[in-house]
Every structure is written in C-alpha cells, then in structure tokens.
Amino acid sequence: NQKISDFLYDFVSLYGEKKWGVSMYDSQNSLINNYINPIIGDMEVQAVTPRVVDGYIQTLQKTASVSTKTRKATTTYVSNQTIEKIIKLLRCAFKQAVRWEIIGRNPFDNVVLPKTEYKKRDIWDAEMIRTALDKCADSKLYVAMNLSFACSLRMGEILGLTWDNVHISE
C-alpha cells in the first residue's frame, strides 16, 4: 500500500514531466505541495473513497490560501476555482492509479464540486491595444505585448521564443 504523497511523486515523474509544460508543471506541483500532501498526503491511496473525497473538499474550503513565489493569495480560504483545479489533478492522477492497477476504481469520478463563479473577461478592441502599446515605455515589454496581441501568444510562449523560431520574411 502506497501513501498518496509517494504516489503523486511517481505520478508527476512518470506522467506530468512528459505531458505538462513548464507553467502547468509548476502550478500542479504547487497544488500538490500546498493543498494535497499537507492534508491527505499520509493517507494510503487505497483508503480514498468518494466519502473521503467529499470530506477533503470540506476541509479545503476551511483551509487558508497559500501565497507562492509567483502568486499572492487573493482570498482568505482556498477558492472554489482552486478546489476545482485540485480535484481535476487528483482525478487525473487516480485515473492513472486505476490504469496502473493500484486501485480498482477512481474515487474522484462523479465528485460534486462547490459552485464556481467565472468572471467574464473583457476583450480589448484595436483602439485599446493601440493605447496600451502607446503608453508602454519599456522597449522589451513593448515587443512582448505586440507579439502577444498580434500572434495570440501567452507569456510562456513569448518568453520561450528564440531567434531560430522567428521567420520575419514569412
């Protein structure tokens, strides 16, 4: 019988390192280190049932948010969006546990998640983009913003660009 913390270490090294990008890898490890291992890391994988999962979600709702080196906690307690991410990660991990024949069924299937409110994002029009670029004084930031708007690139994609990826004539 394997502890959840040990199982997640194996899961991340055998699955996560191959399937996730750098940003996803960091955020998943933060969830594991801040919200999973401290609460249920010492439990055995085989001991997790849907009832245990429901109790875990209740515990998370009363758990203080953790600030990390890249993200400051914006709520007092773990938000419903973060709980959704944690359960999604654990559902994926326990799906692998079923595949690896560690457990017979996934206790994270059919989980009832707390209601999450999603904020509608504002979409910038051409005038708003032009205003932002005009007000940008930093030349490197200007290039990054321009690439982001023109090519729909995310920050990680922009930071990962190298000259051999740039084809100006095309």
Give residue spans per PLM region:
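A short secondary-structure junction motif
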Residues: 11-15, 35, 39, 43, ...
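Basic, Lys/Arg- and aromatic-enriched nucleic-acid-binding interface segment
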Residues: 66-80, 84-86, 99, 103-161, ...
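DNA-binding alpha-helical recognition surfaces that contact promoter or target DNA
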Residues: 27, 55, 85, 92, ...
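Charged catalytic carboxylate motif
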Residues: 7, 31, 52, 85-89, ...
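Residues within well-ordered alpha-helical secondary structure of globular protein domains
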Residues: 10, 31, 59-62, 135-138, ...
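N-terminal DNA-binding module of tyrosine recombinases/phage integrases
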Residues: 1-54
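Short, conserved phosphate-binding/catalytic loop or strand-edge motifs used
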Residues: 46-61, 109-114
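Alpha-helical scaffold segments in carbohydrate-active enzymes
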Residues: 31-35, 59, 82-99, 154
